[in-house]
């Protein structure tokens, strides 16, 4: 997967078995395929964990076969809150967003203020990063939309828990894709 978020999905039917994927590449259904989530993806780790658990409950080996770029922008609760608040504020001019935080996460990526997957693996610096980000987003949430400010500590705890779950899957995706290309292997981007 090279870009996008968990707003869209792929529905696959193989041998009568229906599988719906939002983040995990469809190659996961083939046992010898390595799968990657690249740096262009805005990643809801919560949604990814749910997708992994659903697939593993069906007997698929997923966690050892999916690698995540350390540069992926992470979708966190403030992105979803902003997405929903903006959509509601538009009233009859709503754009039809899924309210899953994808647009606001891309905004943070472009503005160079968002968290990336690698940030979740560095607990010593994580709190300061989240505090800096929430200085900005809590102002918008409270002053523009009249919402309650998010707790830095709650967001740090949530991020650390997700980082611990995914730490073994974060890898140099670009480097591995380069190796595969040099070996003459076929690579499919979706």
What are these regions (language model features)?
Residues 1-190:
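Non-transmembrane, aqueous-exposed alpha-helical and coiled segments at domain scale
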